[in-house]
Amino acid sequence: MITFPNAKINLGLSITEKRPDGYHNLETVFYPVALEDALEIRTSPEADKKFSLHQYGMEISGNPEDNLVVKAYLLLDKEFHLCPIEIHLYKHIPSGAGLGGGSSDAAFMLKLLNEHFQLNLSEDQLEIYAATLGADCAFFIRNAPTFAEGVGNIFSPIPLSLKGYQILIIKPDVFVSTREAFANIHPHHPEYSIKEAIKRPVNEWKEILINDFEDSVFPQHPVIGEIKAELYRQGAVYASMSGSGSSVYGLFEPEGTLPETDWGTNVFCFKGRL
């Protein structure tokens, strides 16, 4: 059985306050994008171990046990005593990009296991499991435009459609650590809340729908800011870094052709339509 976990972008990201536990409260909108990995499972009843993980495409560092698709399997196996499986994961969503690739893989793994083994878990139940794997994992269970707050784990659906808009996602060969991203963050409530800003026409978003991490990340990694500026020069109606980076996306009007640009070596580029 196979499924195709998709990426997400952040539409605005406001760091509103620092919490007593050291984490930060934020507001953002998660929006699904048709940039996809491929995830397949095959049962292996005679296998001498619970799982085997086979990875293809973009290289993923770390031990297999630390991969979120494995953690998702072990999470459900602990309760439902699942049959041993082979996991085949083809990575096309870059990691460390702010696109939620690992979280999406985990959420889609939960949904795949639920269907394959007929566990009859509801979406609400799957969201609870997903939330234990990562703050944004639960978003990918319903996989629809969502307003997120708290530490990115409190969700409410929003009536937003960008259907037809073209999207260009660029990720330079740059890694942004969480510590770097938060280094110069000054929590505040923006003039336009995320919820208010997204109600405005997309061509007004440039000045009012802001990702607070850009002020912290761009001075440390100027190439990311340069990509955003170039997307605007090439006609994007809105451009932003996604999450804490390092990918940047541009939204383009439904009509017309996306620009052909040489973004340099070791740069990931995705063109698609929302």
Swiss-Prot record:
Listed pathway(s): Isoprenoid biosynthesis; isopentenyl diphosphate biosynthesis via DXP pathway; isopentenyl diphosphate from 1-deoxy-D-xylulose 5-phosphate: step 3/6
Record has ATP-binding as a keyword: yes
Keyword Transferase: yes
Domain of life: Bacteria
EC number(s) on file: 2.7.1.148
Uppermost EC category: transferase
Listed GO biological process terms: isopentenyl diphosphate biosynthetic process, methylerythritol 4-phosphate pathway; terpenoid biosynthetic process
Binding site for ATP: 94-104
Active site (record annotation): 8, 136
GO molecular function annotation: 4-(cytidine 5'-diphospho)-2-C-methyl-D-erythritol kinase activity; ATP binding
Catalyzed reactions per annotation: 4-CDP-2-C-methyl-D-erythritol + ATP = 4-CDP-2-C-methyl-D-erythritol 2-phosphate + ADP + H(+)
InterPro entries: GHMP_kinase_C_dom, GHMP_kinase_C_sf, GHMP_kinase_N_dom, IspE, Ribosomal_Su5_D2-typ_SF, Ribsml_uS5_D2-typ_fold_subgr
Keyword list, A-Z: ATP-binding, Isoprene biosynthesis, Kinase, Nucleotide-binding, Transferase
Signal peptide location: none
Pfam families assigned to the protein according to its UniProt record, in alphabetical order: GHMP_kinases_C, GHMP_kinases_N
Disulfide cysteine pairs (residue numbers): none
HAMAP family: IspE (MF_00061)
Function of the protein: Catalyzes the phosphorylation of the position 2 hydroxy group of 4-diphosphocytidyl-2C-methyl-D-erythritol.
Family classification: Belongs to the GHMP kinase family. IspE subfamily.
Protein name (record): 4-diphosphocytidyl-2-C-methyl-D-erythritol kinase
Organism of derivation: Bacteroides thetaiotaomicron (strain ATCC 29148 / DSM 2079 / JCM 5827 / CCUG 10774 / NCTC 10582 / VPI-5482 / E50)
